[in-house]
Every structure is written in structure tokens, then in C-alpha cells.
Design a protein with these regions (language model features):
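Functionally critical mobile loop/hinge segments
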Residues: 86-100, 107, 403-518
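Phosphate-handling active-site elements
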Residues: 37-49, 77-82, 351-365, 406-417
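Short glycine-/aliphatic-rich beta-strand segments at the starts of folded cytosolic domains
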Residues: 126, 144-161, 182-184
């Protein structure tokens, strides 16, 4: 299944705010569980079966908190719930029966999750949803009805015959976006009176899915452009900087004004700061292959025992700290993914060290988000589809544009910086040891921050990436997909890259024996 949605800067690129370690394998599944909770009358079920196909990475069941995420969502939790790490224990305490079954069923996407629910009213409801990358989700199927929903609106689901569906349409004031002879789905910008729908004659059951995102998708939401080339054409007509373009883009999608957009950007910076501190204070929860080291790195930097790399030392500490927080299932921001959550905070810390103000760095975050939207709109943010370049590479590319903007670069320079950074990491394999977002993901975030800073400086100096930015995205995505199609991604075989080494195989076997199903 290809992505057909236009990115929202906060819903899909700089967000969600989530507990780690993975946006595709933790945050997305949590949202899938939560949407199913809504679909089933706010968790009005006596049993739910989680099904992972053997054709998905989820069937391995260890290291990325997928089942913890789904289970938390099924209890009504969102991806930022502070107790997500303990969701399996909480579910047991509440007496919830949520078995996991591995099937051989074909699936539309490698990140597909099927949930089969038995409600207290005697109904059975099944859902098939997809974690699209970066915490974004798609509702693919409800019972036997194929749908295309993305969790950003109020979706009213009505079980009933054609007369009941017609009555619901009259009450809700809009036609269904999907229907068959016994089920219809209505999509709204505003919350519906679900009790009124349930009381309609002929309605067997009705429920409402709630948007689990900061920005509810409007009825007539439309970005003024969706690609880098489109932005440049828009600027040729309207003028303005790349920051002005970011404001115009997000306003078109969400309806938010500039103040509200800036306020949220500043809020995201606050969360990133909290993530850095949580990483520095890390107790090692959730680690398997390595131990937390960001605090030691900070001490070495402060004692000047690093090679003198200036602000790169600051970036290294911050990026590593965020990823160690992420690995412990503590709060981070998918920027654009959980696996790359440390890259932008690393660059932001370096920019702060260089003397830029909070407001300036918040502006640069919006520039980064806009560049990330171009990747989302033309490629993906999930390494299981496009390799590591769509995560670490994307984050580094976004951060390079942000740094170039604060250095005084115009739109061309910002895009050149983004292009250089992404080209540098095109072809980066997704070959984690064992599973999860630990090795090499933590290390690569620091590298991604450094690559962003170097690329920004190169672009300011006039280095030409030659390819337009949209073509850099295309090249990266095509190459990454080809690698994935040959099983060079995310440990699907466990015999490629670092996974194929003697140590890689040993670590994988130990992990399979010792790590809990999560």
C-alpha cells in the first residue's frame, strides 16, 4: 500500500510525541490499538486477539515494543503515555485477555496489524490497520469493508442496513466515504453526537474514531505545494523565505495561524530538551546490546577530552542522549521517526551552543519539518520499506536545511544542504543487531547530526549537489526499496550487513532466547 496522504508538519513529520523506541513499531501500533479501542465503544470488549502475519517484521515480537504499544492503545492510551513500557503488566492487572497469534495471511503492507475483537454486546469486530512510518497510520479495513482512513479526523462507523445508513447520512450531513450493504463510514472535521447516531432506527451499532494528532485534518485542507519544486514555483509567485513557505504549507493543511504554529514548534523544543535530560539520567531500562553512555560523553566533552570539534561535541551528546531515552521507552519526538529522533535535537543543541535564540531554533524546526514533508509526500519514513536512509538520512537532510536557514541561506542553499545530507546517506542499510532501535541506531543519530552540520556548511560555501532535491528523494527511495525488496532491511532474514557476521548471529540468538515478547 502506497501513501496517498499529504503530510502535516506536526502530525506526520515533527511528531508524534511518543514513547520509544520506534515510531513504526511502537507509536504506530499504539495508535492502531487506540483507534480500535474507539471503534469498539471505548474498549467495550471482553477479548481482543492481536494477529501478526509472518510476512511482517512484527511476527518476531521482540525489541521494539509493538505488542506493548498495541496493548496500551487497546486500553485507551496514546503513544505518549508514561506507562507504555508497563502496558502488558497493566493489562494483566485489569484482567484483559489479549493473546498474540502469528498467521501466514498475506498482508497489504509489511507493517500490518490485524485485531479481532469480541464485544460485550455479542458483536465481533475486526480491523486491519497499517503503521505507515513516523507514527502515521492507515485504517485499511473494518470487518469486510475496505477503507482509506488516516486517523486525523472524527470517523463515524455505522453498522446497519441501507435505511439506517441513509438516516445516519441525514443526521451527520455528509455522504459516507466507504460503505457496503451493512456498514458505512462517515468522516468529519468535528465530533459527532454518537449517541444520536446509535439511537437511529435500524442502527445495529455505531462508534466514533477520534483523531489522535495535534492538527485535525480539515474538510478542505490543501497544501499550496507538496514538493520542493512546487515550493519554489509558489515562491516565484508569492515571494517570501523558506520559513514563509513552511507557514503557508502548515496553515493550508491545518488552518492554524502563524502564532499557533510557532507555539507548537516551541513546545516540541521543550519536549526535546526533556528527552535529552532523560537520556543523560538513563537507568538502562530496555537496553540489551549496549549500555547508556551519553552522561559519560557529556563529561568527556566538558573536560575537553574529545578531539576539538566545536559544536559537533554538543550535537553528539544531545543526539545520543535522546536515543538512549528513546531506547528506554521514554518520551521523544518522532523527528521524523523514533529511530532518528536524536538527529534534530543534536543539531538544535549545537545551534543553541552557537548562540541562536529559542525562537530562531523553533523557526528552523519548521524549515526542517517542511523539508521532511517533501520526503513523506514522495517516499516514506519507514526503514522496513525504504532502508535506513528514509529515517537517519531524512532526519539529517531536514536538520541540514534547518542549520542552513539559520546561517542565512536562502531557499536554494537550504535545499542544497538537504540534498547533500541525503545523498551522503543514500544506500544506508537497515541492519540492526538483534532487534529494536539500539545498535546501530543510537550511534547513527550522532553521525546524522554531524552530517547535517557539515552539509549545511558545504552548501553555504557553494557546493552543488547537482540533483534537484526532489530527484535526490527519488534516487534515495528507489535505491532503498530495491534493497528492501532483496531483503536487505530491518533483519527480515538476519543474514545481511552486520546481522550476517558471527557476532551478529550470536547476538541475535541470545536476544531470541533472553528478550521478552513485547
Amino acid at each position: 500500500m502506497e501513501n496517498t496522504k499529504t503530510a502535516d508538519l506536526f502530525n506526520d513529520v515533527m511528531g508524534p510525541i511518543m514513547c520509544g523506541p520506534s515510531s513504526s513499531s511502537t507509536a504506530g501500533p499504539t495508535r492502531i490499538g487506540r483507534l480500535t479501542y474507539d471503534l469498539c465503544g471505548q474498549g467495550d470488549y471482553k477479548k481482543v486477539v492481536i494477529e501478526y502475519s509472518s510476512h511482517t517484521g512484527y511476527s518476531h515480537g521482540r525489541g521494539s515494543g509493538t505488542t506493548k504499544g498495541v496493548t496500551g492503545g487497546l486500553m485507551g492510551w496514546m503513544p505518549d503515555h508514561e506507562n507504555l513500557f508497563y502496558s502488558l503488566d497493566v493489562a494483566k492487572e485489569r484482567g484483559l485477555d489479549i493473546p498474540v497469534v502469528i498467521t501466514e495471511d498475506p498482508v497489504p503492507h509489511v507493517n500490518t496489524i490485524t485485531l479481532k475483537c469480541s464485544l460485550n454486546n455479542g458483536m465481533d469486530i475486526s480491523t486491519r490497520m497499517i503503521s505507515m512510518g513516523g507514527g502515521s497510520v492507515a485504517v485499511y479495513q473494518i470487518d469486510d469493508l475496505r477503507v482509506d482512513l488516516f486517523g486525523g479526523r472524527y470517523e463515524v462507523v455505522v453498522w446497519g442496513d441501507s435505511a439506517a445508513q441513509a438516516a445516519a447520512q441525514a443526521l451527520l450531513g455528509r455522504a459516507p466515504v466507504a460503505q457496503n450493504d451493512h456498514l458505512a463510514v462517515f468522516s468529519r472535521e468535528e465530533e459527532a453526537d454518537i449517541d444520536a447516531v446509535r439511537n437511529l432506527s435500524g442502527v445495529r451499532y455505531a462508534s466514533q474514531l477520534y483523531p489522535g494528532v495535534p492538527c485535525v485534518t480539515r474538510d478542505y485542507a490543501q497544501a499550496p505545494f507538496t514538493t520542493a519544486a512546487g515550493m519554489q514555483a509558489w515562491q516565484a509567485e508569492h515571494g517570501g523565505s523558506i520559513l514563509d513557505a513552511a507557514f503557508a504549507y502548515q496553515s493550508g493543511i491545518s488552518g492554524w495561524d502563524q502564532k499557533r504554529i510557532m507555539d507548537w514548534s516551541l513546545h516540541l523544543l521543550d519536549v526535546m530538551d526533556q528527552s535529552v535530560q532523560a537520556g543523560l539520567d538513563n537507568d538502562g531500562r530496555g537496553f540489551f546490546c549496549v549500555r547508556p553512555v551519553s552522561h559519560a560523553l557529556k563529561e568527556l566533552h566538558e573536560k575537553k577530552k574529545f578531539l576539538d570539534t566545536g559544536i559537533l561535541g554538543v550535537a553528539t551528546v544531545a543526539a545520543t542522549a535522546v536515543m538512549e531515552s528513546n531506547m528506554s521507552m521514554r518520551l521523544v519526538i518522532a523527528a521524523p521517526t523514533g529511530g532518528s529522533a536524536g538527529v534534530f535535537p543534536g543539531v538544535a543543541a549545537a545551534l543553541a551552543e552557537a548562540g541562536y535564540t529559542r525562537e530562531q531554533i523553533a523557526e528552523s524546526l519548521l524549515v526542517a519539518a517542511l523539508v521532511g514533508a517533501f520526503i513523506y509526500n514522495q517516499a516514506t519514513f519507514t526503514a522496513s520499506v525504504g532502508g535506513c536512509a528514509v529515517e537517519i538520512g531524512a532526519a539529517s537532510s531536514m536538520s541540514a536545511a534547518a542549520a542552513a536557514y539559520l546561517l542565512g541561506g536562502d531557499t536554494k542553499v537550504c535545499l542544497d544542504a538537504a540534498g547533500l545530507a541525503l545523498r551522503n546517506l543514500t544506500g544506508l542499510a537497515c541492519d540492526p543487531l538483534a532487534s529494536g532501535v539500539e545498535v546501530p541506531c543510537i550511534h547513527r543519530n550522532a553521525m546524522g547530526s554531524a552530517n547535517a552540520i557539515v552539509s549545511a556548511n558545504m552548501a553555504l560555501g557553494g557546493v552543488d549537489p547537482v540533483l534537484p532535491y526532489d530527484e535526490v528523494i527519488e534516487a534515495m527511495y528507489v535505491f532503498g526499496k530495491n534493497c528492501v525488496d532483496n531483503n536487505w532491511a530491518c533483519g527480515r532474514i538476519g543474514r545481511v550487513g552486520a546481522q550476517g557476521t558471527a557476532t551478529g548471529q550470536r547476538v541475535r540468538e541470545e536476544f531470541s532466547r533472553k528478550a521478552p515478547m513485547d
